[in-house]
From Swiss-Prot:
KH type-2 domain: residues covered: 39-107
SMART domains xref list: KH (SM00322)
Stated role: Binds the lower part of the 30S subunit head. Binds mRNA in the 70S ribosome, positioning it for translation.
UniProt cross-references to InterPro entries, sorted A to Z: KH_dom, KH_dom-like_a/b, KH_dom_type_2, KH_sf_prok-type, Ribosomal_S3_C_sf, Ribosomal_uS3_bac-typ, Ribosomal_uS3_C, Ribosomal_uS3_CS
Lineage: Bacteria, Pseudomonadati, Pseudomonadota, Alphaproteobacteria, Caulobacterales
Keywords: Ribonucleoprotein, Ribosomal protein, RNA-binding, rRNA-binding
Protein name in the entry: Small ribosomal subunit protein uS3
Molecular function (Gene Ontology), one example: structural constituent of ribosome
Chain spans, region Disordered: 215-253
Biological processes, Gene Ontology terms: translation
Record CDD domains: KH-II_30S_S3
Similarity comment: Belongs to the universal ribosomal protein uS3 family.
Domain of life: Bacteria
Organism of this sequence: Phenylobacterium zucineum (strain HLK1)
Biased composition (Basic and acidic residues): 230-253
Length: 253
């Protein structure tokens, strides 16, 4: 089961919590859910150059508090905070209540699964060889403290007539272990040959206690304040040497 299911959904309530943190009844729930989806899509599209990894939406009474985790917060904030104020007004136009924006810097974007996936997708769109892009991203993540990385790419790789899937893995990525802190990211590269899907799993270590806020606590040590907020951190170097695998090839370990 752990091999197929989204690792984020599998671990909700165990070592991480939801990105939308509010409660509503009846038709109000559906309206707020669609509003969250609309806000996230608009922010991801508008802040594409900022390297946005995660958007958390909280809704205290008649307010909307949005926390954006980004690799380049300066792109969002702008000179003397001019851009973030304009962004806040645009987001407020999409919601009913008062909007507060909190920008948090990701200090190690090389170990963030979503940012790794988006970086590989950008390279594929620039016609970089997919194997080279995958290996570079894996090596950077392992060098900066990830305990294991797995990357899947699928589609018309290299412009081939028949679509296929290839994957690489380095270190450990225990998808069945619920206490494992596994970060997951997915995006699509739109190439001239068609769409190529990119999936990334990053293993950061194990969370031994039952703590749904473990991810937020870890990120607090890793990221630094970049707007009105703080940030968070991940695991250390693996005890064993890295192990690299490719589908169809034996391990080098």
């Amino acid at each position: 089961m752990g091999q197929k299911i989204n690792p984020v959904g599998l671990r909700l309530g165990i070592n991480r919590t939801w990105d939308s943190r509010w409660f509503a009844d009846g038709p109000e729930y559906g309206r707020l859910l669609h509003e969250d989806i609309k806000v996230r899509r608009a922010l991801k599209k508008r802040l594409y150059q900022a390297g946005v990894s995660r958007i958390i939406i909280e809704r205290p009474h008649k307010k909307c508090r949005i926390t954006i985790y980004a690799a380049r917060p300066g792109v969002i904030i702008g000179k003397k905070g001019a851009d973030i104020e304009k962004l806040r007004k645009d987001v407020a136009a999409m919601t009913d209540g008062e909007v507060h924006l909190n920008i948090v810097e990701i200090r190690k974007p090389e170990t963030d699964a979503q940012l790794i996936a988006e970086n590989i997708a950008q390279q594929l769109e620039r016609r970089v060889a997919f194997r080279r892009a995958m290996k570079r991203s894996m090596q950077s993540a392992m060098r900066l403290g990830a305990k294991g990385v797995r990357i899947n790419v699928s589609g018309r790789l290299g412009g081939a007539e028949i679509a296929r899937m290839e994957w690489y893995r380095e270190g450990r990525v225990p998808l069945h272990t619920l206490r494992a802190d596994v970060d997951y990211g997915f995006t699509e590269a739109k190439t001239t040959y068609g769409v190529i899907g990119v999936k990334v799993w990053v293993f950061k270590g194990e969370v031994l206690e039952h703590d749904p806020m473990a991810l937020d606590k870890r990120l607090a040590g890793e990221s630094g304040p970049a707007g009105e907020g703080g940030g968070r951190e991940r695991g250390d170097r693996p005890d064993r040497g890295p192990r690299r695998e490719r589908r169809g090839e034996p391990s080098n370990a």
